[in-house]
């Protein structure tokens, strides 16, 4: 039997996932993180992106995260997300439109603040599209 740990993925709206998993992959503030059983304790910010969950029996699930916090403790991992959406629930047309608007905003931005806001929106839209693509490929 594979080594496992307990994972909770919680957003402000709902608990997205709670169960036993083999591993997760998530975008931390310092880069990509792979968490497996017996990982060292850790607390880090999460960038907009996805969490790839490998469940207890090997099934995979992908969830979009708009940002948040990851806490790793012995035997348990908690993700507190600003927003969490299952890949199958994302709307590709809306994500493409958000990407287009963010790119247009970046091209017309006047100043660092406008550019930073547009850049953050673009990163979220690209992350959603990536999750949609991975979800489609898994089906």
Swiss-Prot record:
Q: Which UniProt keywords apply?
A: ATP synthesis, Cell inner membrane, Cell membrane, CF(1), Hydrogen ion transport, Ion transport, Membrane, Transport
Q: Where in the cell is it found?
A: Cell inner membrane
Membrane spanning segments where?
none
Gene Ontology cellular-component terms listed: plasma membrane; proton-transporting ATP synthase complex
**Which Gene3D superfamilies does UniProt cross-reference here?**
ATP synthase delta/epsilon subunit, C-terminal domain, F0F1 ATP synthase delta/epsilon subunit, N-terminal
Highest taxon listed in the record's lineage: Bacteria
Q: Which Pfam families match?
A: ATP-synt_DE, ATP-synt_DE_N
Check the record and name the CDD domains matching this protein.
F1-ATPase_delta
Keyword check for Ion transport: yes
Which cysteines pair up through disulfides? They are none
Membrane topology is: Peripheral membrane protein
Q: Which InterPro entries match?
A: ATP_F1_dsu/esu_C_sf, ATP_synth_F1_dsu/esu, ATP_synth_F1_dsu/esu_N, ATP_synth_F1_esu_C, ATPsynth_dsu/esu_N
Q: Which GO terms describe its molecular function?
A: ATP binding; proton-transporting ATP synthase activity, rotational mechanism
Keyword flag Ion transport: yes
Q: What does this protein do?
A: Produces ATP from ADP in the presence of a proton gradient across the membrane.
Binding partners and assembly:
F-type ATPases have 2 components, CF(1) - the catalytic core - and CF(0) - the membrane proton channel. CF(1) has five subunits: alpha(3), beta(3), gamma(1), delta(1), epsilon(1). CF(0) has three main subunits: a, b and c.
* Similarity annotation: Belongs to the ATPase epsilon chain family.
Please name the HAMAP family in this protein's record.
Answer: ATP_synth_epsil_bac
Record-given protein name: ATP synthase epsilon chain
């Amino acid at each position: 039997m594979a080594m496992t740990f307990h994972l909770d993925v919680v957003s402000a709206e709902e608990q997205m996932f709670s169960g036993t998993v083999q591993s997760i992959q998530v975008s931390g503030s310092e880069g990509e993180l792979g968490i497996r059983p017996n990982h060292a304790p850790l607390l880090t910010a999460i960038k907009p992106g996805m969490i790839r969950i490998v469940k207890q029996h090997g099934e995979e699930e992908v969830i979009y995260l708009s940002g948040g916090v990851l806490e790793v403790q012995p035997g348990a991992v908690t993700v507190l997300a600003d927003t969490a959406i299952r890949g199958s629930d994302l709307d590709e047309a809306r994500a493409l439109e958000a990407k287009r608007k963010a790119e247009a905003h970046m091209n017309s931005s006047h100043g660092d603040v406008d550019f930073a806001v547009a850049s953050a929106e673009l990163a979220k839209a690209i992350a959603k599209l990536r999750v949609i693509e991975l979800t489609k490929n898994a089906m």
